Amino acid sequence: LKISEDPIPTFRKLMKEYSSGYYKVPSVGAGTANTEFESITGMSLHYFGPGEYPYKSILKETTCESAPYVLKNLGYTAHAVHNNEANFYGRRSIFPNLGFDTFTSAEYMEKEEDKNPLGWTKDEVLTDEIIKCLDSTEGSDYIYTISTQGHGAYPEEELIDDPEITVTGAASEAQNNQWEYYCN
């Protein structure tokens, strides 16, 4: 695969200047809620039943130790921001059980109608929402932000006119288009 330029130069710069590492997630391609659960709680899904989604089971009924609860004990206000619908994976009712004080979903975002070619709300709306969270409190804030713009499936047809980053060398032109869409 040949990519015309590094698609993540800012991340590479940050990786060189600060501590960094690899992050292993429990699912790829679906199951975002399980990755969120592990990130927010530090608990592995290996302690749950096969195919279980804590968001769809235990978290509907009870709270759970989590980063938001720990940080709230240190004086932080905990916010969750997600540019998708609040009821998807039951986040509207789950996030309070994970210790979040506020939850802003796509329905409450001013630019919610700004979509990418696949229909996902663009990530640029998240910046304004994060700033609103920061401005809403006097003290320190923990803001957990979930993006949807990069969700696949990635298009096999060319959707970007004059892409900044070009990709060649995949097994097919359709795969080149998918990689190019992802990189841009």
Locations of regions flagged by a protein language model:
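Solvent-exposed soluble domains appended to multi-pass membrane proteins
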Residues: 1-184
